[in-house]
Amino acid sequence: MKLVVGLGNPGSQYAQTRHNVGWLVVDEVARRWGAVWHPDKDAEVAELRMGAAPGEKVLLVKPQTFMNSSGRAVGPLFAFYKLEPAALLVVQDDLDSPFGLLKFRLGGRHGGQNGVRDIIRVLGTQDFARLKIGISRPPAGWNPADWVLSRWRAEEAETLAELVRLGADAVEVWVSHGLAEGQARFNGTDLRPKPDPAPQPRVEAADAGPHHPT
């Protein structure tokens, strides 16, 4: 069995904020596989089987505790199903990666992401996989806490939709083929807009006609 946790905050006012991109990804996975969300203590969960029959059992999780207490939702599920850290994937926003980047990482510190921080605290280990989706550092003058709770801009919508689609693809690969395959296939993902090519110098055609003195 695999546990896939999408980090975010409950409430419609947070649904389209940067901090909730993990929820968007697990919602897309649930939609693809026809899984239905239902409440389970401090979380909403959706169960599915992925891959060829009978398939790998997967429990998608959206903590309902607010970000900073995500471990309160994850810990009891982790214990109930007697899981090892290798069976857990946390889908999170990442301030340290530019918007448009997506990558897997195994273990390591929380990097200031308070949902990951609390999961590490509750589980007592860092040794679980994360799927990190870049939201970029805040612009000058922004507090990071305000930035992660800000809404996506209209001009970001197309890239966001593609990131969510690829994020769901990445979750499916992790479940079916493991972390190494996920890293190989997705850690080079870069959806940042490419700058227009620099204009090339104009080359004037040589004048083949006769030259006359003025």
From Swiss-Prot:
Family matches, as Pfam families: Pept_tRNA_hydro
UniProt-annotated site: Stabilizes the basic form of H active site to accept a proton, residues: 93
Reaction equations catalysed: an N-acyl-L-alpha-aminoacyl-tRNA + H2O = an N-acyl-L-amino acid + a tRNA + H(+)
Site (Discriminates between blocked and unblocked aminoacyl-tRNA): 9
Compartments in which it is found: Cytoplasm
SUPFAM superfamilies: Peptidyl-tRNA hydrolase-like
Residues of the active site: 19 (proton acceptor)
Ligand binding (tRNA): 14, 66, 68, 114
UniProt main location, coarse: cytoplasm
Entry EC no(s): 3.1.1.29
Record GO biological process: protein quality control for misfolded or incompletely synthesized proteins; rescue of stalled ribosome
Residue ranges of the TM segments: none
Source domain of life: Bacteria
PROSITE patterns assigned to the protein according to its UniProt record, in alphabetical order: PEPT_TRNA_HYDROL_1
GO cellular component, one term: cytoplasm
Keywords for this protein: Cytoplasm, Hydrolase, RNA-binding, tRNA-binding
Biological role: Hydrolyzes ribosome-free peptidyl-tRNAs (with 1 or more amino acids incorporated), which drop off the ribosome during protein synthesis, or as a result of ribosome stalling. Catalyzes the release of premature peptidyl moieties from peptidyl-tRNA molecules trapped in stalled 50S ribosomal subunits, and thus maintains levels of free tRNAs and 50S ribosomes.
Oligomeric form and interacting partners: Monomer.
Family: Belongs to the PTH family.
One Gene Ontology term of the molecular function aspect: peptidyl-tRNA hydrolase activity
Name the UniProt record assigns to this protein: Peptidyl-tRNA hydrolase
Residues covered by region (Disordered): 185-214
